[in-house]
Amino acid sequence: MDSLTERCRPQPLAALGPADAQLHGPAAAGGGVGPRVMLSSLCREHPWQGRCPPIPAHGKEVRQLRHLHRTRPPDTHQDMARGPGLPHTHGLPARPSHVRHQTEPVQVASRWHVPSDGLCRPCHVHQLLHPPLVPALGA
């Protein structure tokens, strides 16, 4: 029977790419399988916009507005391992989302637009400033 469970069964870590090995860390280097490996299998098997299933109430806005902030820091374990951007730093939100009806003040006040020099600029969508990113870069 070609069920969803059969098509999405976990794969050994050896069957995944080097980015997945970085994602799952040295603890999984023995070739074991587990729920995080299962996520990578799902990403390959089904068209999740090229990523793991979105975080509830957050992933949709990120996909719709992916063209607005190309240098934003990552918010998921896959983006952390594969995509460019800054690592998550304590005190800073993982990734902004531009939502018309936004109810979380910390997200509203922390739109990220990071030019190549690492200095803050007003976001061109909401024209809000965020905390400096230079300390987060270790400079």
From Swiss-Prot:
Organism in which the protein naturally occurs: Homo sapiens (Human)
Tissue specificity of this protein: Widely expressed.
Name recorded for this polypeptide: Putative uncharacterized protein encoded by LINC00315
Gene expressing this chain: LINC00315
Annotated region described as Disordered, given as residue ranges: 71-104
Top-rank taxon: Eukaryota
